[in-house]
């Protein structure tokens, strides 16, 4: 459903420490990466909602929330029309597309469109 929160990322300077913190706090079972060669530690927190701890130099900048959309191209255009910024969509092969965005106040978020044919 468009606008539903489907994923979030926790940027971490030390992914081991962050995984231990969030796993310990909520009992989340944080696993290894689903993508070879990329340290992206995924977990599920509820029905259909997942997250990941990922290494980042921007640790401390806040959690990135991903919002579902049925048409990522139209959503990117709408973000720009409303005064936000949006990068071009990027593929997550065999999973879907995402676009990194900011709202009019500079708050980061991302758009997501599932697509098993993304490449």
What feature does the model see in each segment?
Residues 22:
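Catalytic core of tubulin tyrosine ligase-like
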């Amino acid at each position: 459903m468009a606008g539903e929160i489907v994923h979030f990322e926790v940027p971490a300077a030390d992914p081991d420490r962050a995984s231990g913190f969030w796993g310990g706090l909520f009992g989340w079972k944080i696993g290894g990466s689903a993508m070879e060669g990329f340290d992206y530690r995924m977990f599920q927190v509820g029905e259909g909602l997942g997250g990941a701890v990922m290494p980042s130099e921007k640790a401390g900048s806040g959690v990135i929330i991903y919002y579902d959309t049925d048409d990522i191209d139209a959503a990117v255009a709408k973000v720009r029309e409303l005064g936000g910024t949006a990068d071009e969509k990027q593929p997550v092969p065999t999973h879907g597309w995402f676009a990194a965005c900011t709202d009019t106040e500079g708050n980061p978020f991302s758009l997501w469109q599932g697509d098993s044919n993304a490449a």
